[in-house]
Amino acid sequence: MKNLTDSFVYLGHWPSAGSFGFNTDILATNPINLSVVFGVLIFFGKGVLNDLLDNRKQRILNTIRNSEELREGAIQQLENARARLRKVETEADQFRVNGYSEIEREKLNLINSTYKTLKQLENYKNETILFEQQRTINQVRERVFQQALQGAIGTLNSCLSNELHLRTINANIGMFGTMKEITD
């Protein structure tokens, strides 16, 4: 694995006449360096990302199944309410003389309460799906960022040797000495 990483590092490493640092200008960045970074990100992040997406998919599907079961229960309640409504309507025909307005109120209350229950269940299902999608997207973003950061740190650590560290330290000490002479 280290040899594979080293080969990518050597492909993307060109000796520079200037200084060592990150190039933040994306248009001036070497396409080989970009392809190496993307290759490392894809290679290391693919398995973790697939597992994470599969887990999220299962959770979302379970939530949808639960919501569908709740919906079916609400539909069953609606069927029961309709049966009850038919029963109330036949009783209303029998008792029309005594209390037609009271029966109408009960019917409307029953329909309104059933409608509100269905609406609440539908809203809950939609909110749950949206929440799970947002949470999944955020976790995937976080995981990809962590993988990219770990890959970049690993690549940097494998590229830097003790000799390069010493040369960098000596060059910085020399620059600070020159700056001190200029300010004195």
Swiss-Prot record:
Question: Coiled-coil regions in this chain?
Answer: none
Please give an example of a GO cellular component term from this record: proton-transporting ATP synthase complex
Q: Which residue ranges run through the membrane?
A: 27-49
Q: Name one GO molecular function term.
A: proton-transporting ATP synthase activity, rotational mechanism
Where does it localize?
Plastid, Chloroplast thylakoid membrane
Does Transferase show up as a keyword for this record? no
Q: How does it sit in the membrane?
A: Single-pass membrane protein
Q: Which CDD domains match?
A: ATP-synt_Fo_b
Q: Which UniProt keywords apply?
A: ATP synthesis, CF(0), Chloroplast, Hydrogen ion transport, Ion transport, Membrane, Plastid, Thylakoid, Transmembrane, Transmembrane helix, Transport
Name the InterPro entries on file: ATP_synth_b/b'su_bac/chlpt
Please give the HAMAP family that the UniProt record associates with this protein: ATP_synth_b_bprime
**Which family does the similarity line name?**
Belongs to the ATPase B chain family.
**What does the record give as the function of this protein?**
F(1)F(0) ATP synthase produces ATP from ADP in the presence of a proton or sodium gradient. F-type ATPases consist of two structural domains, F(1) containing the extramembraneous catalytic core and F(0) containing the membrane proton channel, linked together by a central stalk and a peripheral stalk. During catalysis, ATP synthesis in the catalytic domain of F(1) is coupled via a rotary mechanism of the central stalk subunits to proton translocation.
Give the record's subunit note: F-type ATPases have 2 components, F(1) - the catalytic core - and F(0) - the membrane proton channel. F(1) has five subunits: alpha(3), beta(3), gamma(1), delta(1), epsilon(1). F(0) has four main subunits: a(1), b(1), b'(1) and c(10-14). The alpha and beta chains form an alternating ring which encloses part of the gamma chain. F(1) is attached to F(0) by a central stalk formed by the gamma and epsilon chains, while a peripheral stalk is formed by the delta, b and b' chains.
What additional remark is attached to this entry? In plastids the F-type ATPase is also known as CF(1)CF(0).
Protein name, as recorded: ATP synthase subunit b, chloroplastic
